Amino acid sequence: MLKNLRLRNAVLTLAAIAGLLFTTNDVTAQNATLYKTVEVDGIEIFYREAGAADAPVILLLHGYPTSSHMFRNLMEDLSDDYRLLAPDYPGFGRSEQPPMAEFDYSFDNMAHIVDGFLDELEVETFSIYLMDYGAPIGYRIAAKYPERIESLIVQNGNAYDEGLRDFWVPIKKYWNEYTLENGKPLEGFHSPAGLKWQYTHGVKDTLKISPDNWNLDLQHLTRPENNEIQLALFYSYRTNVPLYPEWQEYFRTYQPPTLIVWGKNDYIFPAEGAHPYKRDLKNVEFHLLNTGHFALEEKGDEIAAYIDNFLKKNKVQ
């Protein structure tokens, strides 16, 4: 009898374990990152998506010269509770690169494409993760649809004159004198050495930064005409600066809950650009992290925890 009881208990235990495994696998499958495309204004936009369809949306906007690849780990970390959407802009990552003769590579147009992306996916309300180029793209959308923005997550994304320092000196020269001669030095920023520098400068432990990052970026940047596209966007960045007062007014008027997670050693967008947010925003959580421009590469777990706690604290759920 004891033998039969033990056998019965063993069977029940195995069944319970199997059920747990099936449940875990179901959850894992539901939250796995998916790799999709959608057509926006006739352009094929590649994007990553993770999390349940009915979960609160976080729109992840990448910077220069990268792609949605920069969010790969963050999406896994947050997908249990949020729906994460990370598009590649035209000419970046795996999205289509229309010829410059047929497409306006400007920040106004990039924001228009992301706006259309949200429409295609029928996204109504959302939080935005704004990094580097993602900031001027995202702030255009936030200022246009303030009622749709649940919160802002700002990671080395600028909206103040104080944030444009030494790195921007040759770029400002390009704005003032739009010539091939002034554009040529800027190509170094997306050269193999320049890409590696962007990922490793200001990082505490460079051995933790995978070279796959800049090798993948380089693969996309070496497409025909992509160098010219990057120079066009350097020139277009000048159109963001006159909009800073408008975005700052948006902060003051609508007071979106805002999380600042900023790599304080960033040479491109230094910490001087992070502090002014505190002037205009009342509900702001502020963290300067001991890392560089691509803060997620070294501080991804820390940033994910800050985001999760911040959104739950502000009842974005």
Question: Language-model features: where?
Answer:
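Recognition helices and adjacent regulatory flanks at domain boundaries
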Residues: M70, Y89-F92
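The serine-hydrolase catalytic nucleophile loop
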Residues: Y64-L74
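A short, Lys/Arg-enriched amphipathic alpha-helix followed by its capping loop at the start of a domain
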Residues: N73-Y82, E120
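Bacterial N-terminal signal peptides that target proteins for export
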Residues: M1-T13
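Bacterial N-terminal signal peptides
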Residues: V11-L21
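Sec/Tat signal peptide C-region and signal peptidase I cleavage site
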Residues: N25-A29
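Structural cue for short, hydrophobic secondary-structure segments
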Residues: L60-G63, A86
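Flexible "cap/lid" subdomain of the alpha/beta-hydrolase fold that forms the substrate-access gate
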Residues: N31-T33, V40-I45, A50-V57, L85, ...
